[in-house]
């Protein structure tokens, strides 16, 4: 994972790149006049690093709100700060300083070409790759820890890593506390498990600080436990691994698969009839079964806008004032990603979309 910028003094050019999944952020702000009459560009891993620059114009990007209402985070290259952009994952940029001309190119993309191998061979190959990646993070002579929820993904990483410590958080409410699983695995590995129970007051009390560190609006509440995990870990270690991203890679989300009811409905009802029903309900007020008929009628391009969906794009248009409805809606934005995988199966299309949006 990386985000870096290199200054080529001989060619008077700037080169910047971001890792393939966008784990590390990289923001930039092109300027027609950097203060000396010549063009320039600000860049950094946080937008707040631009705020004190005298020629940085502080203004809200009204176009950013429309897709945010559906996806619950800033998922476009444009940020909520007017004129500030995110370099997309797996992209690099070059800037010719004398002219200010910027060029952005993609250097990597997912490959869904089928490769026929025995299942056991896939398992062995995957295990080898994961162990190699985990081991690469242990090169530095520092303590390494892992975030451990007790679920499959983080447990696998912890078992491969054998960290110095594991960190877990739970909620001070019986039905939302799974730290006992993390403690059980840590004991089996012979590793100390550091735990914290988050109270309701602590949960809501952290939101303002979280928003400050995120630079942009973020309404996915998983950021709260991650905030406390990072806070605990930073007091004791400098490197932490987690199981983030595994659901997108290995189709772990429940919405990647049709429910038994959907499979039965698709088997009994012809596609033409399902599409007619799907088109009909799009013009009707919401009712129980509305989403069911929509999902059974069409391919993902017609309804799937990512696993973090809050408001349907049509609902967003009903609540936004005219000044804020000029940006792309989520469906339009996602369509650009679907165009990259036109011949893939429905599952791969959903995965490609989520992998493309996971850290943009």
Language model feature labels by segment:
Residues 2-6:
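A short, Trp-centered hydrophobic/proline-enriched beta-strand micro-motif
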Residues 7-120:
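N-terminal segments that mediate ammonia production and transfer
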Residues 10-17, 23-33, 97, 110-347, ...:
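ATP-dependent adenylate-handling active sites, centered on carboxylate activation for C-N bond formation
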């Amino acid at each position: 994972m990386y985000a870096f910028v290199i200054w080529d003094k001989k060619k008077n050019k700037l080169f910047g790149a971001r890792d393939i999944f966008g784990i590390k952020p990289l923001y930039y702000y092109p300027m027609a006049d950097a203060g000396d009459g010549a063009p320039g560009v600000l860049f950094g891993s946080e937008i707040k690093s631009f705020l004190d620059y005298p020629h940085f114009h502080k203004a809200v990007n009204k176009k950013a709100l429309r897709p945010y209402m559906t996806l619950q985070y800033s998922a476009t290259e444009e940020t909520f700060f007017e004129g500030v952009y995110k370099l997309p994952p797996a992209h690099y940029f070059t800037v010719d300083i004398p002219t200010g001309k910027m060029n952005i190119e993609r250097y990597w993309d997912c490959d869904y070409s089928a490769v026929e191998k025995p299942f056991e061979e896939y398992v062995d190959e995957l295990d080898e790759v994961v162990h190699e990646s985990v081991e690469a993070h242990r090169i530095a002579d520092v303590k390494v820890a892992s975030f451990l929820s007790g679920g499959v993904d983080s447990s696998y990483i912890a078992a491969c890593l054998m960290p110095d410590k594991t960190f877990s958080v739970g909620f001070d409410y019986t039905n939302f506390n799974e730290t006992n699983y993390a403690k059980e695995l840590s004991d089996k590995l012979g590793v100390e498990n550091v735990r914290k129970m988050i109270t309701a007051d602590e949960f809501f009390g952290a939101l303002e600080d979280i928003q400050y560190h995120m630079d942009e609006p973020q309404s996915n509440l998983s950021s709260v436990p991650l905030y406390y995990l990072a806070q605990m870990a930073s007091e004791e270690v400098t490197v932490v691994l987690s199981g983030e991203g595994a659901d997108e890679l290995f189709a772990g989300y429940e919405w990647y698969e049709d429910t038994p009811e959907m499979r039965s409905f698709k088997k009994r009802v012809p596609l033409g009839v399902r599409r007619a029903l799907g088109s009909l309900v799009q013009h009707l007020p919401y009712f129980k079964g509305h989403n069911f008929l929509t999902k059974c009628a069409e391919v993902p391009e017609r309804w799937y806008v990512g696993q973090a969906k809050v408001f349907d794009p049509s609902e967003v248009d009903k609540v936004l004032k005219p000044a804020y409805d000029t940006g792309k809606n989520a469906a339009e934005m996602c369509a650009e990603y679907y165009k990259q995988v036109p011949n893939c199966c429905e599952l791969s299309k959903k995965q490609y979309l989520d992998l493309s949006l996971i850290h943009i």
